[in-house]
């Protein structure tokens, strides 16, 4: 505003010194004690009440209360700093927005936030996002910080943002005020120290008096950030007996580890104070390191401690770095996006403003001090490829896996230092921006996590593997589950676990790859084949290999034949076997005995300790967690078959288990069933009553163009939303969730998350073939949501389409805007119908 009304401080002498307050002023006091701050608060509060002002006291400190609600014009707003920066800042933002124009505020001493946030940086960020908003609304607000408890950088940031910054001293029981910044006001004596006596303020202008005053005040050099002070104290505690280190360890874990009480307690059981200090020493910035980092570190520690030294020589060392959650918030605040972030957190802005915030997150600038720390980290890694991985606060904890919801970005890390640095920053921005992806937003919404503080940390890992000519990759990568949820044979031991293996980078193990298949390994019998017809082992094997191309400085996909021409620095026969079936067919066709090979890892599974090692590791981890677990890993071998395994990730596997045996009803005529027989299903023993079936007709879907197939996916998403709370089965051709419409329906998991059952139908001649992609992110979503899965492949599983399409199509009633797709999507009501399955007999039916 061009003109701002003058307001009294409650002290006429002080008013003369600073020419009074102005609407919009934020007033920051540097004090030696909260009692001194109160000396300034009391007259300000009394004056505000006398003037009939709306007075708001923001209470969060552990010190004595500064204001009481003695009248109707006074509000005491209590906010809990233990919930973290974002929740705290959002609650204050919402309060200020609600109180509107012209309110007067008193905030508790900001220094009291340090024991909760452990970082000067975040106190500065809070002030930077709150002060301008208060200014815009013509408020006046009092703040305080304790002198000597904050860094010069924090004070400089506050000085830059606030309208008034004042030093308050008590010398010989007298109060002195020394204005350091008074915005848009000036007088010849304004910036001299002033002796305050009641309503009188006397400027100390004499050089002798000023020198005597300031010489009696102890001046402190720049102070270490609270974060570094806490680390120094923790290092000193290492000299104490172990039992005396526990309290210090718990405090440091709250700064670095965080997480749910269950995960925190598990970490406390396995991490020593020295362990936590080692983690903190590799952190860039401050704040929590996030769930993915914690899970990886905890898994390694469990194997080291509980593995009786067996794993010590077999686990590949790691030298990861962690970018703390405070960096994420600082990036948003320093680029001026906090108001947009606050609006995006509202119900109206949650989806509508996310694209705008995502675009900004992709284009911001990091503060210079962080850029310097990033550069030092990259200098450490040199030209080794690295991967920049999301590690949000809620990831990989009990209850929420966030599998594949946030980005992980490979940095091949070639070129000049400047080029490598730009590549790293771009990767970091991409991970941050993925917090605003539609899939991540849907996941948080569907899991009831919208109001949870979802802070994003980053895990920076050296890519496991080696250079092979101009490519870089590990020999083996994959995912492992301690509990086998996809049992196709009564002999399978569900508790032995299962692996999904690929050669090269693990991207093919977690994504549903077009025309390619990972190797499924049951750890009770590693050579047991999954259900496939004899002679189709080649079809259901891996054909492509993901690598990092050092020459092209990018992720790349190559054919298996190309990669096998490299010097693998290991015995090829560990991975490749002669394809006897193909060789036999070639001989029968008179083509000679040309060798054909199959990537089946037979040598690895029979001639090394790899399967036994992985089975034991999964058992140890699930025992320690008290819960089934899911891991991501790599394995590398030397020319003499020496094995090293790298545990990249570990998280609780959210599963309801196999369940009690189910007695399936006798079937006199299979034509009475929607489907019936023995088949491939996941979800254990079930009896699921159905209310509706949504069926995508394969022939009609096949006739559509690619754009219309995507439209079908979007309308299934509409049906999914409309049928929430209804027990519904979704059946369609090929793979649900594929990115390739030629292989199935390309919907996102959030577009089928409310289904009770999903079925994938094989369609002869169309190219549609079911594939669960065990261990993939899509698989994890199914498990976490408790959705029953069945692959409908004849002749083992008889499918009677007429039991669906002969019933009236009610799509127009459920989703009127989808009615034009009634010829493709058939929605029927099926009261009295149920899906039943039995693990022992491997029978499954819908009748």
Residue ranges, per PLM feature:
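C-terminal regions of RecA-like/P-loop NTPase motor modules
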Residues: 2-3, 185-222
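Glycine-rich P-loop/Walker A and Walker A-like loops and their local beta1-loop-alpha1 context
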Residues: 6-62
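Short, charged/polar "capping" segments at the starts of alpha-helices
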Residues: 37, 62-68, 150-153, 738-740
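Conserved inter-motif catalytic segment of the P-loop NTP-binding fold
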Residues: 50-115
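Substrate-engagement module of ASCE P-loop NTPases
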Residues: 116-117, 122-149
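Phosphate-binding/switch region of NTP-binding enzymes
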Residues: 145-198
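Conserved mixed alpha/beta core segments that line enzyme active sites in large multi-domain catalysts
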Residues: 148, 264-265, 270-310, 365-763, ...
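A conserved helix-loop-beta module that forms one wall/lid of the active-site cleft
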Residues: 276-342, 348-368
